[in-house]
């Protein structure tokens, strides 16, 4: 029995030593688990960021693709419209005689004028390209003068077309619905402001002689005065029209009041009839400004001026196309 005690004690000591090592091992295991959990959390954050970046890149590609598709659709629509206009011209919708044209405007109104303007603009662009080629080729003054005169005559044609269109629908012509949205922002009484056009040209045609600068300044001043007079006339017409329509508002529907109402409408209609006159005067001012500008400038300067005017209008139309085709977000 005595011999058994040491072995029993030794066994007990070994067991105690094993128990003393277990807390350290547990701590190491806990630390290892914590590191693994932390690494796993960091990996998840990284994966989430990568997923978010991929999603943002995907959405960016989709937006870019949609924008490109909208531009392509706009180009296709423009091509389709040009083809429809070409077919319409081949079918004889555009009438050459002024009497028949006026009758056509009465029947087709705004649509007929819009199609006429598209045809005019197509021919105008062709003539501008011809002028640009002549300028770049350093053509002589005689050749340039022939192209410049042709473009000036073409401007007279659109003024005549606007006059005919106004007889059918003066509101359509005045509002500029036949123009692109960006062009309408700068519209004045159905067209460009002569004074603003001269201001643009004076900075684009340098160098100019003192006599030319003086001539353009005087022309700009007289154009501005004429514009102010027409604008004031339009304001007076609007005020008078508003007062006429506001008369006896809210009155009962008796026979006398009905007759009064009809009388007011007749007066208002008569006043609206003067809108056509305002448009005609504004177009006359525009036409005279172009003619005076041609007299002040040399042939080569006149050619450059027509190119500047055309390029400015083209940029406004391009801006409208880009604006309408932008992503709608």
Swiss-Prot record:
GO terms for cellular component: nucleus. Residues 33-46 have a biased composition (Basic and acidic residues). Residues 1-48 are annotated as: Disordered. The gene is TGA2.3. It comes from Oryza sativa subsp. japonica. This is Transcription factor TGA2.3. InterPro entries: bZIP, bZIP_sf, TGA_domain. Transmembrane segments: none annotated. One of its GO terms (molecular function) is DNA-binding transcription factor activity.
């Amino acid at each position: 029995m005595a011999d058994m005690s040491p072995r029993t004690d030794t066994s007990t000591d070994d067991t105690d030593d094993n128990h003393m090592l277990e807390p350290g091992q547990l701590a190491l295991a806990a630390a290892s688990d914590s590191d693994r959990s932390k690494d796993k959390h960091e990996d998840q954050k990284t994966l989430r960021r990568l997923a978010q970046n991929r999603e943002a890149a995907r959405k960016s590609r989709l937006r870019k693709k949609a924008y490109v598709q909208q531009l392509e659709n706009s180009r296709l629509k423009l091509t389709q419209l040009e083809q429809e206009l070409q077919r319409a011209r081949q079918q004889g919708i555009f009438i050459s005689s002024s009497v028949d044209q006026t009758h056509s405007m009465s029947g087709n109104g705004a649509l007929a004028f819009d199609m006429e303007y598209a045809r005019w603009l197509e021919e105008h662009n062709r003539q501008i390209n011809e002028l640009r080629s002549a300028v770049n080729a350093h053509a002589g003054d005689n050749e340039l003068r022939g192209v410049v005169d042709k473009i000036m005559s073409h401007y007279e044609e659109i003024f005549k077309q606007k006059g005919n269109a106004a007889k059918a629908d003066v509101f359509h012509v005045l509002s500029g619905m036949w123009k692109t949205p960006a062009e309408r922002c700068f519209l004045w009484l159905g067209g460009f402001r002569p004074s603003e056009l001269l201001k643009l040209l004076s900075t684009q045609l340098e160098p100019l002689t003192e006599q030319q600068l003086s001539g353009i300044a005087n022309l700009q001043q007289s154009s501005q005065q004429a514009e102010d007079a027409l604008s004031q006339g339009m304001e007076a017409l609007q005020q008078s029209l508003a007062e006429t329509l506001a008369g006896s508002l809210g009155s009962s529907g008796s026979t006398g009041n009905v007759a009064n109402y009809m009388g007011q409408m007749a007066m208002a209609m008569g006043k609206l009839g003067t809108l056509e006159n305002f448009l005609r005067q504004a177009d006359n001012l525009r036409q005279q400004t172009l003619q005076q500008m041609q007299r002040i400038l040399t042939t080569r300067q006149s050619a450059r001026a027509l190119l500047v005017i055309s390029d400015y209008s083209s940029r406004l139309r391009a801006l409208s196309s880009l604006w309408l085709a932008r992503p709608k977000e």
